[in-house]
Amino acid sequence: MIGSFRWQRANGRWLLEFMQLIDTPAATSPFSLRIKHFNQDFRGMEEKDASTSLVAAERTPTRVVFEMKDAGRVVRVGYEKKGPDALLAWFDEQEPGKPAVHIEFPYTRATAR
């Protein structure tokens, strides 16, 4: 499955992501999330052929948490179903010597008019 995400902040900075969920026996991890980041000029933030990969650390019928560990830095991205029409996505980052980061993105299904 593929998807995209755009985050525009009040200070004018923004981020665009293309995401791919991989759930096949041939994948590096049985269930993983690959992300390619772009800036507002649509330039890749990772190296040309690189992407960020996170593996599933927790998986239930209503929640999945992906994790990446790299030289002391830990990044976790989670998605949790909060009701029939609500989803909470979140991002956590911990790096030695830096303040921890936690950002939440609540989503509610839009109703057709």
Placement of each model-derived feature along the sequence:
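Central antiparallel beta-sheet cores of small beta-barrel/beta-sandwich binding domains
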Residues: 1-70, 75, 110-113
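Edge beta-strand at a domain terminus
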Residues: 55-56, 82-113
